[in-house]
Amino acid sequence: MLSALVMWLLPMGEGPRFAMDGALALFALVVFAPIAETLIMGSVLLILLRLVGPTAAVVASSAAWAVAHSLAAPLWGLIIWWPFLIFSTLFVVWRGRSLAAAFAVPAAVHALHNLAPALAIASSPSG
């Protein structure tokens, strides 16, 4: 919904392009990216939580991911901050239970979040 709204408000914006299709797209977007990004995000959050409170750490993390994703497609950052706000919040909340859960839960939610777009990319003829 958020991406559709941004694209409606700013139709000149271009979304990210993925130079892959089929099983590679599914693996990259549903397995690799969520695990790799969660490992990076969680490590940064663990450092931030030593320096600032949980709210500031979550906001800083999601803002950093928005900037990082904007490098690939400028408008993508406007869209991606929200999911990373959720992923970062999940990490901080589940960290109270266990470090393994703090990494596993956001990675699983991220994978599910990426599943529908990954299926669309994987099934498109041009990737």
Residue spans for each PLM region:
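Loop-to-helix transition at the N-terminal end of transmembrane alpha-helices
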Residues: 16-29
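Transmembrane helix-loop-helix hairpins at the membrane interface
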Residues: 3-4, 26-127
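Membrane-interface helix termini and inter-helical loops of multi-pass transporters
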Residues: 8-19, 126-127
